[in-house]
Amino acid sequence: MIDEKLNTVEEAKVEEPKIARFTEFETKYNSDITNLSQFKSIVETIPDLLDFTYAEGPDTYLTKPDGSFGRYRVAKYPSDTKYAQWTLKFKPVGAKNNISRLEYNWRVDGTPEQEILDGATAMGFTFNFKITKQCHIYRFKDATLVFYSVREEGITKEDYYVEIEITEETVHELTEDQAWEVIRKYEKILEPVGVNAQKRLRKSLFEMYKKDVK
């Protein structure tokens, strides 16, 4: 009798690939200033909170014809940080949403703003728009939860959003399914303030506020 085990062909398990390094994996949701207090109350009771930061300041967006864009960010508060950052973002070819994008960040503290903007212009970038954000940032090991307002330059009306972002430093250790597990975990926690899968925004802030530049 031939051992059935010898006739068994084991199918090789196809391992799901990890997310690429420098990937920004996040979801956003519309909110309202009336949700801020409850958001903070909920998040501050979640175990393993690493730290909280409040920051505000302008984000200047610049675009290129190929669809990529740059963002120059300056943190005005806390005032002693003198935080400045230049970011390049790329939307993957064929992507249907902005949940996962390539993002490269450089700290540029101490570099004059005009030097950054002139350098961006020399690389083919064109100014598109400027917004000011006020952010309540809660950092956990696996994700960062943020409630923030957005105000366009020259406009008094503010928009409000909640954001769940997978930790950038370790996102490449996860598969996409594992990243979604983290997103869904925090969506369930934040459901009382209107955060759920049905309310995920398909557009990024860039797509919501960008101007048609000719």
Where are these regions (language model features)?
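Conserved, surface-exposed functional patches that form binding/active-site neighborhoods
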Residues: T126-E173
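Mixed-charge, glycine-accented linear interaction segment located at domain edges/termini
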Residues: E169-E207
